[in-house]
Amino acid sequence: MSKKPYRIAVIPGDGIGKEVMPEGIRVIEAAAKKHGVAVQFDHFDFSSYDYYEKHGQMMPDDWKTQIGSHDAIYFGAVGWPAKIADHVSLWGSLIKFRREFDQYVNLRPVRLMPGVPCPLANRKPGDIDFWVVRENTEGEYSSVGGRMFPDTDREFVTQQTVMTRTGVDRILKFAFELAQSRPKKHLTSATKSNGISITMPYWDERVEAMARNYPGVKWDKYHIDILTANFVLHPDWFDVVVGSNLFGDILSDLGPACTGTIGIAPSGNINPERNFPSVFEPVHGSAPDIAGQGIANPIGMIWSGAMMLEHLGEKTAAQSIVGAIERTLAERTLRTRDLGGNADTEACGKAVAEMVD
């Protein structure tokens, strides 16, 4: 066993987050037991509509005190649009985590798994395997801007992109380091400097400057419009793709869609220096339309758990989970309905746990 247990803050959140979270924990516990990793799960009920309904806010005032000393945050999903506006639930929880815990890296794998039908022609497992690195705390999603003269002919709105040298350089450093660690050693930058004439040329300048520190990494850049086309036409070209907050947001959803489904995609909102806990969550969201039916696919939650273990330094345990996911997806009867199987959420989660080696 590790010297002391990793303390994980568990926040199921809304909708199917509450259903897939137990399966994620089940698989982590299976991997932890086999690989001598000690894990302690602490459960929290905030960052959910249920909490908002009772307290009028998404999280308690002392939320940072409650979870700030944990090693990581394992997050299910947030949002219930029929009951609470998305901007209220998101900005009242996940955005706070990202900004106040300085989770400046959003990291998502794009990988075609066995048993998952690919919408792209003539693609098989192994053909699509890359990472999208998204700047997560500034860029186009700043709060700088405003609205004036509402409901008049003079009405206008503005929202400014914010790029700082510190912010741009640190995300590029993370991306180049990741590319350097991979066999292909190839980085692609998303830009639009032919149309966005101030911030994007600056981004390009910083990419070129950072590249000089990594002579062993090949790099290129594409404008975001053609880059999205190449994700579909030539996904095998890519290894590590880095983009600003907006461009990274677009690409990190498009990439998993090219592998057949975003329903199994994981993600990490990461503070690489570990000054604060990082958040690991599935991409799929709260899915109110299927919540409560026990049919949600738990793979995204489970895969996010593997990313969390790798972030904590438990690479062998993490790899054992990813391998178990691959073996489970290869068996049609063990897949959930969205992937053509007939397993429910619990059965799929148990299958992955049993296949952990």
Which residue ranges define each predicted feature?
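N-terminal beta-loop-helix "entrance" segment that forms/cooperates
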Residues: G36-P60, F231
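Glycine-rich phosphate/diphosphate-binding loop of Rossmann-like nucleotide-binding domains
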Residues: A9-R26, A31-A32, T152-I224, W237
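Glycine-rich phosphate/nucleotide-binding loop
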Residues: Y52, N230-T333
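Glycine-rich phosphate/pyrophosphate-binding loop and the adjoining helix
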Residues: T137, S143-S189, S193-I196, K315, ...
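N-terminal glycine-rich phosphate/adenylate-binding segment common to multiple enzyme folds
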Residues: Y51-T158, L246
